[in-house]
Amino acid sequence: VVVWLPTIFVLLNSALVWYSGLVELSTLEMQVASGEAAAAALEEAYAAFQGMMPTLIMQTLVLLIPCIAITGPFTAGVAYVVRNWARDEHAFIWSDFRDAVKQNWKQGLLTSAITSVMPVVFYVCFQFYGQMTSQSMLYLVPQVLCVIVVCVWMCGLMYMYPQMVTYKLNFRGLVRNSFIMAVGRLPMTVGLKLLSLVPLLLAALVAFFTPYMQYAMMALVLYYLLIGLTLSRFIGASYANAVFDRYINPNIEGAQIGRGLYHAEDDEDEEDDAPAGE
């Protein structure tokens, strides 16, 4: 969680700048309605706010590059611990985390570095091709391709880190397998990604439709700091384990399948091991 604090800080700072701009516009609207300010001042304020938004978005995305890039090795460590929990296996939180970071830091850093530049590249390409569509509708094709590439990459991350800490793969094989599984299990993958965004959506609704934006942001930050990040990773790891059991483990000699799942035989074994008279 600590390694994600810079990212959270950048996002919160940008959200506060955007919110303060909305508050100023709302205040100016009330002044215009009461005759305390001219309508021309409100139009200028709206134009300034609209002109500020592209700069604010670009600045935020650029600042997020180093913040996200440093998270990869630590995310690999978390993925190893959470994967063991999802398998119902014991994990020494600190020592296993540290060992997983040491063993997977290169692939983890490369993965997070690519992830960090994705939003900037997507925003620039989407804006550029969006402007070019005024000249030719053919530019919709690369614009849609940008959306598809980013979505597939983000969905592939659900499988990338668990694979990284489970199998010995080069980075190309890691990315290829993740993309194949993300596309092959697209409905569930997208559904789980959207499910992880529900708290963010609820906070956004509270912020937009009530005067309690500060409390919504505080609750959102506390949720992700306390359980949100770990819970979403646990759910993702559980599903990734099931996908690996279907597509990867049957092709590996001696690989166990179904770890972490309930089996009726487990209850029978416990009854057999119980002392007589109990």
Where are these regions (language model features)?
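Hydrophobic alpha-helical membrane segments
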Residues: V1-E278
